[in-house]
């Protein structure tokens, strides 16, 4: 494992020229005695400003925060937008958001369709439905940026997690967009000139602390002042930004242990051809040690519906911000 200074220097030196992958530190998946294993990535906006001093300030701050919160970097890989696009990593990462953007008109149930029309107060006969990508395909003049601009002319309505809608009328055409923001969201990562930096994190710090105080709220203006997002928000110019908002919140960290399990496989497995079934993530090793069969352990990645403490939800949501051991107990109690 290389020093923090050496790793930061490698990122700064190589990130601008990495079109595919740069494996700076091989990810030590599952190889830890610490209690939590997470996936973190640094988003393209950190590296897009072309200001080496600002990029260095960002790296210095982020790695200092990791040290402050006892979060060990156990793997580091630079990934170019072309690689993310080729392997469809971001499509899988965004899950339901992506599926609805690409196929809403085909996959929505009659019940969901009616809920959309009721929520928006419009008639089905007057307003056909389009996912964001579907609208682009049928309206070739709409780039991701132009569609994003249209989407944000009105406040969207939330049907449920990952499912946002709004009705529009443009040049005499009426229509409903579903997740119309997503093509631009996706393009931000898959644009060939953009890069992210994947970090495998091992830590004994509580998951909730890492999410709330290390990373900070999704909306940087609400983030803890000590957090990475809070620090970016408080002094954007130091890091090369005019301002910092949810649109450029700079970092991602797995929301919970089972989501982290999925993300490790999606990114490290998908991009680096790592067989995560043989190079098992920490949570898989611990599930098997707790008496869960390997088959049952891997079924958890499908995000089944489970019940715990009187709540019935999908496994990822029910274990957000929880440490690995209690999350395993929740899953095991449902088997």
Model-derived features: positions:
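Non-catalytic terminal and connector segments of soluble metabolic enzymes
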Residues: 1-335
